[in-house]
């Protein structure tokens, strides 16, 4: 998980739930985190999109990416919905976040 230190309380809640590692945001945070199977980013979608765009190569090998706002209102499955992001976004509903899932195969069920 990647978070700004100002969102420490939310980051700790998410870490406690998921058991993931916490990486404080830095210029290299996303490239460092791309070795993981999934990344939860506690920040705006805009920041996450700009940081992951140059790192993406294949839907089959890229990590799942979920973006969570700092108020835990929304958990957005941004990349890799079928490779873990949808499941993680749904898991975060335990903390009150509404999962945002946009895969056509999931939406039309």
What are these model-predicted stretches?
Residues 28-84:
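Glycine/small-residue-rich interface belts in oligomeric ring/scaffold proteins
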Residues 21-26, 41-43, 67-68, 98-103:
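General beta-strand structural signal in soluble alpha/beta enzymes
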């Amino acid at each position: 998980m990647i978070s700004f230190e100002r969102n420490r309380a939310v980051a700790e809640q998410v870490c406690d739930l998921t058991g993931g590692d916490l990486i404080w945001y830095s210029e290299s945070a996303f490239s460092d985190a791309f070795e993981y199977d999934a990344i939860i980013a506690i920040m705006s979608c805009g920041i996450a999109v700009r940081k992951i765009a140059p790192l993406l190569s294949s839907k089959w090998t890229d990590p799942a990416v979920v973006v969570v706002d700092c108020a835990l209102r929304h958990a957005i499955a941004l990349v890799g919905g079928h490779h873990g992001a949808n499941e993680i976004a749904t898991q975060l509903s335990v903390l009150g976040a509404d999962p945002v899932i946009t895969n056509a195969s999931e939406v039309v069920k």
